[in-house]
């Protein structure tokens, strides 16, 4: 079986997402070593001066939106990473309350692809690294990360949060 060709930074988002779906042998592969290594290579382990991590069973989305709103009202430049998306992939990353264009996501995917070398990443790990890279590029004051299904081994936990909300 031939490997899918690597998309370019200018490839459509749908092409990248299809590529990411087939990149790793497991949809969920808990552990932080792989994703931490790539994040270290990209210097994105501290995406902003202040980081919140939001975890728990219920209310994560509401908590993230509330924090985002309060922090923006106080004059901070804020980024939020959440998952899963409901309609569009671009819902996963917001900066100052707005989704980013697809081209920003595909550019970040190309950066991660170049940095990862032979390290296999899951769809979620790739998406998390993408959010961190986008946040770092935006020079934010605060980042809010919503923990996904992985709990303590979730890819968002590669970032040493200043505040954890449970």
Give residue spans per PLM region.
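Short Gly/charged-rich anion-binding patches and loops
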Residues: 15, 66, 130
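Generic N-terminal amphipathic, Lys/Arg-enriched alpha-helix
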Residues: 13-24
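A conserved segment at the C-terminal end of the G1
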Residues: 50-54, 62-79
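Conserved beta-strand/loop subsegment of P-loop NTPase cores
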Residues: 163-166
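ATP-dependent carboxylate-amine ligase catalytic core
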Residues: 7-8, 12, 26-28, 32-47, ...
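Surface-exposed charge patches
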Residues: 18, 69, 133
